[in-house]
Amino acid sequence: MLSRYNPADIEAALLQARGELPFPPGHRREDWAKAASALGGPLCSALLAAAERASASQPAPLPATLWLECKRTGQRETYERPRAARRQALANLALAECLEWEGRFLDAILDYAWAICEESSWALPAHQLDLADVDDPIIDLGVAMTALELAELDHLLGERLEPALRRRIRSEVDRRCFRPYLARHDFWWLYNTARRDVNNWNAVCNGGVVGAAIYLEKSPARLAAMIAKAARSLDDYLATFDEDGGSSEGPGYWSYGFGYYTVLAHLVESRTDGQVSFLDEEAIGQIARYPLRTVLSPGRYVNFSDCSRNVHFCRAHLAYLGRRLGIPELEGLANVQPLQPEKESLTWALRSLFCRPDPAAAAPTPAPHDYFRGMQWMIARYDPADPEALVLAAKGGHNAEMHNQLDVGSFIVHLAGESLVAELGAGRYTRDYFGPQRYEHLAASWLGHSVPVANGHGQLPGKERRATLIAHIASPAEDCLALELREAYPQEAGLASLQRRIYLHREPPAGWVELEDLARFGSGPGMLESPLITFAQVELGPGYVLLRGSRACLRVQYDEAALKVRVEEFANVDLAEGPQDVRRVAFSWRAPSREGRLHLRLIPGQG
């Protein structure tokens, strides 16, 4: 447990340590020349060009009425986009100045950094709908990330910054972050409570605030108190992972939350000469391997809950973890991630220059079988060495997970780099998507998932709405996940039992997926429907349905005598990655029955 670290021992470690930080300030020209050489001419040029564009412009205005757009209309982007543009410009300017060290970006850095310090709040309006009360600052994701970015700006440029700006950074970070962090215990993201559990916010907020303190806080006692508080808090974050290192938030939020956990761990180890380590916990190795175990095909990952369908990891995060923990596969995965420092935050762009993967590390090959026991996630691969081969991902779990969707029993069928039976990922992030109307959005509702419908009733939210594991089988011939789903449904559904069994069979030439739903109704005959959610084109034939994607085709075979099928179209569904047409292919019994079976065979490449 990280809470074994108490303030007294941490303060002693701080006083004994040399206190070196992992990233060189800009005046260490030899280090920066090596970084520029490793980055390469084209990427350096792109970074300098981005800085020149920022230098030729002014910080985008952020008027109070723009803040209120989220409260008034529910839209977040109108404020978040110009806010993010300010921080991106500052990151590019700071790194360009460190690469050149000629002073030509210093005035623009002053303008952008001063404008950020002038913001009434660094929070996001979605997290604080009313205009900010400057006398009662909150700490959210935006506050914590901004604090770390300004602290690292100060570290990199030091005395080249205007003295007043350096004083302002310290004053603002102390007022907005350090004082409320030490004084308050009621931020929802700090600890697991009876009201709610923590999620990625815990790691990001702790990482940003305490990471900034490692750079800026001069009092060893005060810094020790913050590190100790973070240690206790981060124990609750680590508890959100299951015993196999799985996070129900998905790979995208793993990258975000565990990324900031790693940022803080790196800084704490450096500042204490390794006497305080957040990476020596037994669970860390399993958590670090999570992206290796959730891959569907290169660049595509299991995207249950609000996870994006297109996940990119921070190269520096994977590279550092791989080297620090002795997991070379993470360095191999880092090598196939995009490197675009001019599009990254200062936090990650800086690390991309100095935490580089071994270029000889090969892209990893996943295992045939992966299973996360606590979450009841199964990933089964027909041929892990073939990136085009069939992959099945299925889940149990419950309906109060982090970034929850009503998806107990849902699954993905992935072939040739695309999911033909798909998860929609997140809906567009708006005020309502995170409010009482969340489950009215197709992406979060049972209607937008490949889960059964009993007597017209879908699943309900709540931790008690869960799957019970019947069996998980992983063998050379097949993988199977068998679940009892009855508790996910309301009493009105009339279910005595609803079992789902889903298999990946490894029969040549390409394998196939089998879906078997077994329903028993308690009070009388009932109806069962099992849909497939897809972005693919749908073609109906006698006893089969074709799901035709851009690169592959899946043939869904069913018994016409027992089942009927209908196709529902949802045009321009408002998803986080943009509007997209979605199709729901619903198979159902032809007549009500007290009990029965719904059986589908999903066969690759039979178009």
Regions found by a protein language model. Give the residues of each.
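Extreme N-terminal leader/anchor segments
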Residues: 1-47, 84, 95-98
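Long, well-ordered core segments of solenoidal/helical folds
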Residues: 51-62, 109-125, 168-192, 225-245, ...
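Non-membrane alpha-helical segments in proteins
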Residues: 85-99, 111-115, 144-155
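CBM-like, beta-strand-rich accessory domains located in the C-terminal region of large
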Residues: 129, 144, 331-343, 429-607
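Active-site lining segments of carbohydrate-active enzymes
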Residues: 131-252, 263, 350-363
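Carbohydrate-active enzyme catalytic cores, enriched for enzymes
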Residues: 258-420, 474-475, 591-592
